[in-house]
Amino acid sequence: MDPREKTACFTGHRPEKLFPSDTETAAQVLEIRRSLHARILQAVDDGYTTFLCGMAQGVDLWAGDMVLSLQESVRQLKLVAVLPYPASVRGWPPEWQRSYLRVLKFCTEAVLICPGYQPDCYHQRNRYMVDHASRLIGVWREGCPGGTQYTVQYAEKKGLELDLILLP
């Protein structure tokens, strides 16, 4: 069996793009997280056992945390960190750095895409995840340019099943 059949990957905007007008509320974050958790649970119910996480602030790290919490009851789940380059967290707010390190510590495996920063290292990371999965789980504001839009479009082109939370 092709391992991609049981592998899903994540994409989603960073916090500042999730709530572009600084109107983030705890209720909005909770609703997105609930929807994301439901989609991960559905993937597990559908037989997915490996989850690829790009380890970015926001949706990626939320999803990574959720998979790790599910590992307590579903032992065969694997979380794979797909890192664009080693120092990708430099300059992040401390709370996101802590979240990154916590998730990375408990990942089953880590894949390093580039040995150092390169202009397209984030796109390379996103392509790697799509090329190694059969389902994309994400949070997307359609028309919002950036890595999430690129990843959704690339996944469509590659024929992945899309399970997206669409934001207004």
Can you say where each PLM-predicted feature lies in the sequence?
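Acidic/glycine-enriched connector segments
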Residues: M1-P168
